[in-house]
Regions:
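Juxtamembrane intracellular "pre-TM" segments in multi-pass secondary transporters
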Residues: 45-77, 252-255
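Glycine/proline-centered helix-kink
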Residues: 2-14, 91, 197-208
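Short, hydrophobic secondary-structure boundary micro-motifs
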Residues: 41-42, 49-50, 74-77, 94-95, ...
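Helix-loop-helix hairpin linking two adjacent transmembrane segments in secondary transporters
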Residues: 2-40
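C-terminal transmembrane bundle of multi-pass solute transporters/carriers
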Residues: 25, 29-32, 96-257
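Residue-level signature of transmembrane alpha-helical cores of multipass secondary-active transporters
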Residues: 5-6, 10-14, 78-83, 105, ...
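A general structural signal for well-ordered alpha-helical segments in protein cores
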Residues: 59-60, 77, 93-94, 141, ...
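A single, central transmembrane helix in multi-pass transporters
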Residues: 7, 19-26, 64-118, 216-217
Length: 257
């Protein structure tokens, strides 16, 4: 999903070089509508696993249970905040370099693809236990180079290297599942996804405000520093010894859709 997000961003950057922003937005809206129609008529109905009637109140109760565990809380924050801050950096590619934004988005997508393949397919379990923190730092540290207004090759390399760090999310999701009872695993992933998308939006807004006040390169540097600080502050709670057994819960009713 992340690869497609960034790939779409790269395509948008390419379209901006050939079309007006208005036409590019219309093309994006048309593709979104096509995807919605495909999902509506192309996906088959599946029975829900949870019992009971969907309820917003039950959704919030389940979320409260998920949030009540301190180790799980650290994992959620590590999945949401550093990622969202770096997406704020990516949201400034067009304003940073309208001519080369497509290249930067493409490099970001390529880096994410490399990281996901290497981590998901080839990384042994022993490495997964020790490379989580370095990957989380890799997500942000390369963006510090934008403080020096790098040339395009250096900027593209920095973006590609940083995007490899998105693979840390795979390791954090494994950690989340190890800390979550089976009956809440689906809602845990849903909460993780919702929080991630929310923080990505927040990161883009904050980065945009900073870019308006200063410059895109300065805003990207600030967002990268903030991501590093958040990652370092969460490191203690993400140590392997903090893993605990999933809590016991009462039978879970279906969350609201």
């Amino acid at each position: 999903v992340g690869d497609l997000h960034l790939g779409g961003g790269g395509l948008g950057g390419v379209l901006l070089t050939a079309l007006s922003p208005r036409v590019t937005l219309l093309v994006g809206a048309g593709l979104y509508l096509t995807a919605a129609v495909g999902a509506r008529f192309g996906l088959s109905a599946r029975p829900q696993r949870a019992s009971g009637r969907p309820s917003v109140a039950q959704t919030w109760r389940n979320n409260a249970v998920l949030w009540s565990s301190v180790p799980r809380r650290y994992v959620f924050l590590a999945l949401w905040v550093p990622n969202g801050l770096i997406v704020g950096c990516e949201s400034l590619f067009v304003s940073l370099s309208p001519r080369h934004a497509g290249t930067l988005f493409a490099c970001a997508a390529f880096g994410m693809l490399l990281g996901d393949i290497a981590t998901g397919r080839f990384m042994p379990a022993s490495w997964r236990r020790v490379l989580g923190a370095p990957l989380r730092l890799l997500l942000a540290v390369p963006y510090l180079v934008f403080a020096f207004h790098p040339a395009l090759p250096v900027a593209a390399l920095a973006v590609m290297l940083a995007s490899i760090g998105y693979a840390a999310s795979l390791l954090l999701q494994e950690r989340l599942m190890a800390l979550t009872p089976n009956e809440l695993s689906g809602q845990a992933l849903g909460l993780q996804s919702s929080g991630t998308l929310t923080m990505q939006g927040v990161g883009a807004v904050v980065a945009g405000v900073l870019a308006q006040c200063f410059s895109p390169s300065a805003a990207m540097t600030v967002m990268a520093v903030a991501s590093v600080l958040v990652t370092v502050s969460l490191a203690r709670g993400l140590r392997p010894e903090r893993v605990e057994s999933p809590i016991e819960t009462v039978p879970v009713l279906a969350p609201a859709s």
